Amino acid sequence: MLFRSMFALLDQHREVADAPAAKDLRIERAELQFNTVSFSYESNRQILFDVDFSVAAGTTTAVVGHSGSGKSTLARLLFRFYDVDRGAIRIDGQDIREVTQTSLRNAIGIVPQDTVLFNDTIAYNIAYGKPGAQQEEIEAAARAAYIHDFIMSLPEGYQTMVGERGLKLSGGEKQRVAIARTLLKNPKILEIGRAHV
């Protein structure tokens, strides 16, 4: 059912299209700026009002707020699932509306709040972040996510099957696998749905 829903989403018409002259995103520092961003999903219900902040390269920023305050909306706008109503989102000075969505999304890694794992091995689930990854790369990502020692304690190690949606792992273990997957991708910008670490 989950995959059917995902594929149905992929088949739908995109809300946002690349600009005719869109170029690939060029990242040198990975500085992120939200410049007076306003957004509404519907014209009569504005979610964001003149949001203005910068995240310097190499720093960590937390966005906190009550349910419905727009935290997830910021992430959706950064991924360009929607375009802003007013203002601009820039990465290294480039308006994300002027770059290809593929290059934008390739530059961003996300650890979602609700972890999705496939009914396959731990190695497969981590390697999904970088198709063709070597075992050494998978293990390095797992070490960085502090899950390697746990994996090695399992009888099958990296070949352990995680079960449907990762049901054979605890919530924290699933999140660490998802973190390793994202770290293996080596994104310039990392977005974490909730503080997992």
Range-by-range predicted roles:
Residues 6:
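Conserved, function-defining core regions and hallmark residues within catalytic/recognition domains
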Residues 11, 16-19, 23-194:
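ABC-type nucleotide-binding domain
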Residues 1-2, 196:
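Short, small-residue-biased leader/transition segments that mark boundaries at the very start
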